[in-house]
Each structure stands twice: as C-alpha cells, then as structure tokens.
Amino acid sequence: MNSPSPNGAFQKNRGMSPEEGAILKETIEELRSRIGDTFDGITVERVTIGIFFTGVKLSNGSGGLCFTPIKEIPEAVCCPSSLRALPWSGKFRGRPIADFLDALFDRSPMKRAVGIAVVNALSAQFLECNSSPGFVIERGSDALDEIEIPDDGNVVVIGALVPILKRLKMRGKPYSIIEMDPRTLKADELPFWVSVEKTGEVVPRADLLVITGTTLLFHSLEAILACAKPGAKVVLVGPTASMLPDAFFRRGVSVMGGDLVTRPDELLDILCEGGSGYHFFGKSADQMAIRRTEPAS
C-alpha cells in the first residue's frame, strides 16, 4: 500500500498551513507537555523491523507500531545502502527518544518508520483510557468495519484498504481509489483507480474520505487534509496512525483507527518472525477507534 506525495494541487487552504510534518511536530509537543520532566529521560529498549510492521518498546514499558515501508527502499540491497538506510542497526538499545524523534524528518523512510513507532509508543499511555476531552476511544473496534458509507455520497479511498474496498464493491456504486501502485488492486477495483496526479481534483469532491495512515509516514497527510472540503467525513486508519489525535482532529479528521500495543515484548517477538496483524490482534495489541466528540476547531 502506497500513499500519494503532496504536489501543487494540494495547496488549497483549509484553515491551517499544510506544512509537511506539522502534525507530527504538534503531536511531539503535546506529548512533551503531557509527560513533563521525564520526557527527555525516556530511551528505546527494543526495536524490531518486520516485514509488515516496525515495532519499538520504550524504557517506560510502552510499545508502538508503524507500517514498514519496504517498497520505498529498493536500493537497500547491499551493505553500504543498508547502512545508509539504518545506520543504528545493532545500536538501538539505550538511545534517547530524541534521536528517533529527530529522525522523523530524515530522508530515510526506515528511520521515519522507527520514529513514528516511538511517537505511537509515547502516546499509548494516554490512549489506554476510554476517553479524553474532545474524543472517545473504543478498544477492540475496527474503524474500517464501522464506517457509515453514504448510499449516494462520493467516496474516495487513499490507499489499497481492502476492508473498505470490499464494502464499496458490495454497495455497487462508483467510488475512487487513489493508489500509487495499481498492481495492488484487484481486477474489479481497477476501473475505479485514480492516479496520484489527480488527487487534488478528486479529494475535494469526497463526502467520505478514507485515508491510509502511511500518508503520515510520507508527510503527505497535511496537504491531503487541506484539500478536503468542509463537512467531509474523514477517516484515517492503520497502525501508523496510533497516536494522540488532537493535531489530526484540528485538521478535520473525524475518526482514527489504529492499534494499541498491550504486550510489547510478545508483539516484537511476533514481528521478528514475520508476523502481521492476524498474529497479534487481541493478543499483544488491540485495534481501537478514536472518535472526535467536538467540532474541529
């Protein structure tokens, strides 16, 4: 699953600047404020880069996940290239989280993936409760299964999100899929495929906009949200989007569907063995839906 990168068509303003990486920067500041004086003392205890997901465990016991962007690093097939992609391999343990948070804005997608997993791990302690001002959390809930699809509305999906595509096909009406690699789509989905270059034309027409969380990894989410029309229902899903929701909700996101790590060591062991969500959901991580309860500011 790949996600579009921002281009000039995304620069329509929705009340906030679509600065690349702004959501992550705001979320880090929110976490720093909530955690307080102990923030800078937190270190990374374990890192696992699996086939499907990258996971971390922090010194405070929290764990976090991120999508592993394997397709984005085809050059990492020899030792020098691999070293550039992940120069800290073998030296992750004990590093301060500041190193990983700085890497969120590095050119290497693998460094960014580990950094996002750290942000999700830092967020976990605040997402274990059922609610917080401005939002409510539903543990064990798959946001994709519970999306209310408008019968006649215009639906746009960014990324090859299989569960929602199945439901849209059952609806039997046109929809749009924005996906960088159309080879990830099935034959009956290809007629609805839209090239990334047309994202700026298609997104503003969406009544329901469902976005893969990998857009956060590639710093394209802000531009996409800035392009959505006022009043559109926006759903962001995937393990990558498993962090404090405030910065997302301020930009019009209605629901976030992510994963909450409950047993970090067990989860990382599964990732080491090439495991996917089917192997850890309900065991070492729970799916969750984070719903906005107040209007976007």
Where are these regions (language model features)?
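Conserved acidic residues
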Residues: 153, 207, 254
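NAD(P)-binding Rossmann-fold cofactor-contacting core
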Residues: 173-187
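Short, conserved loop/helix-junction motifs that constitute active-site signature segments
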Residues: 150, 168-171, 203-204, 225-231
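Structural motif
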Residues: 156, 208-212, 235
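C-terminal functional extensions of proteins
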Residues: 233-297
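Electropositive, gly/pro-rich neighborhoods at or near active sites that engage anionic ligands
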Residues: 6-169, 288-297
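Residues in the short beta-alpha loop(s) of Rossmann-like NAD(P)-binding domains
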Residues: 161, 181, 240
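Short acidic low-complexity segments
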Residues: 193-204
